[in-house]
Amino acid sequence: MTSCVAKEPIKKIAIFGGTHGNELTGVFLVTHWLRNGTEVHRAGLDVKPFITNPRAVEKCTRYIDCDLNRVFDLENLSKEMSEDLPYEVRRAQEINHLFGPKNSDDAYDLVFDLHNTTSNMGCTLILEDSRNDFLIQMFHYIKTCMAPLPCSVYLIEHPSLKYATTRSIAKYPVGIEVGPQPHGVLRADILDQMRKMIKHALDFIQHFNEGKEFPPCSIDVYKIMEKVDYPRNESGDMAAVIHPNLQDQDWKPLHPGDPVFVSLDGKVIPLGGDCTVYPVFVNEAAYYEKKEAFAKTTKLTLSAKSIRSTLH
């Protein structure tokens, strides 16, 4: 007989938009839900839409002083509050106070953080913990509901790459990334896809809270291996761009020897190594400053045990 994991019901949920102020789908949806929350209301749930970086939203820029989605580590969250701190660090402390504290029993049960990418990644769910039965079950439910539209899962669990995301203050952090969409732009198709992902996620939580038992399941995920920079010259300037064969090919297998970059003089730089990888965030506009042309991932399968709420 398969064991069933009993988990506490979900009570407090936040939906974050505007963590990056120029990623407009989340901004648009959260602003709408703040005016009229009927769509995200579920019986027995406290669902709070929230604009995380209002100053960046006002200026339609990714951030004011630094990336809000990278400062939710305990060092930044524990710094003494001061006007000298970067705006986003001060804002992180405010958000941690409202929805955390991080790693505490009082923290919100679940945070959805809504993002857009200029990369051709379609609907993407971002997972931070490969052993989380509840989120694997939720992602399986969302993927099934979104079919036949693909919904990929990006696993950012890595021993040396620490993200310190805004959503990491919650017990269950969920990143939702939908593209391609230029920053500072709204596209109806992307808006519709993100809206449906949130609907299905909230439906799953409601079913779970009402006592539905979810049988064992498994999902394919793409786990981060490393980030790849653009080729650079002696001055540190970019010396090549993403090759046309790689452009828009997120989630597709990339084999050793396949073209990855091409320089202005036509030199093609292939993928090295000896294993097939799956590229994501290919040519993401916001990652030029981070010196990231794309991320290599490996494809694997995660399994979750059967789950049900402890109330039933």
UniProtKB/Swiss-Prot annotation:
Q: Which reaction does it catalyse?
A: an N-acyl-L-aspartate + H2O = a carboxylate + L-aspartate; N-acetyl-L-aspartate + H2O = L-aspartate + acetate
The active site lies at E177
Q: Which GO terms describe its cellular component?
A: cytosol; nucleus
Q: Output this protein's name.
A: Aspartoacylase
The enzyme's E.C. designation: 3.5.1.15
Cofactor(s) listed in the protein's UniProt record? Zn(2+)
GO MF annotations, alphabetized: aminoacylase activity; aspartoacylase activity; hydrolase activity, acting on ester bonds; identical protein binding; metal ion binding
One GO process term, biological-process aspect: aspartate metabolic process
Tell me which residues bind N-acetyl-L-aspartate. Answer: R62, N69, R70, Y163, R167, Y287
Q: Which UniProt keywords apply?
A: Cytoplasm, Hydrolase, Metal-binding, Nucleus, Zinc
Positions of disulphide bridges:
none
Tagged with keyword Amino-acid biosynthesis: no
Q: What organism does the UniProt record list as the source? A: Mus musculus
